[in-house]
Regions:
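Non-catalytic accessory regions flanking glycosidase/transglycosidase catalytic cores in CAZymes
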Residues: 1-93
Length: 93
């Protein structure tokens, strides 16, 4: 069994806040909701997140494509990205 000793009287080094680098934004369809956006805004303000990753950008609830040979609709996708950028987040694609 390995053991480690910690001297609590010794001063330590500042910890790098690696958690501020990125937050997972869950599924893209959730980011269309006002309550989700408010929670994300608070999280960015309080925690200082810089990057956001999420999944489901082309999921059915984003309505990018829903008919064979039909047009593409990026309105919801653009709405999400515009909101992320307004918060100072860099969305990862």
């Amino acid at each position: 069994m390995n053991s480690k000793s910690i001297n609590c009287a010794e001063s330590g080094k500042p910890m790098t806040p690696y958690w501020k680098q990125m937050v997972c934004g869950d599924r893209a369809g959730l980011a269309l909701r006002a309550d989700y956006r408010e929670c994300l805004r608070i999280a960015v303000r309080e925690c200082g997140f810089q990057n956001l990753r999420q999944h489901g950008m082309f999921h059915d609830d984003m309505f990018v494509w829903h008919k064979k040979d039909g047009p593409f609709n990026f309105q919801y996708l653009f709405s999400n990205y515009d909101y992320y950028l307004s918060l100072g987040l860099r969305p990862l694609v």
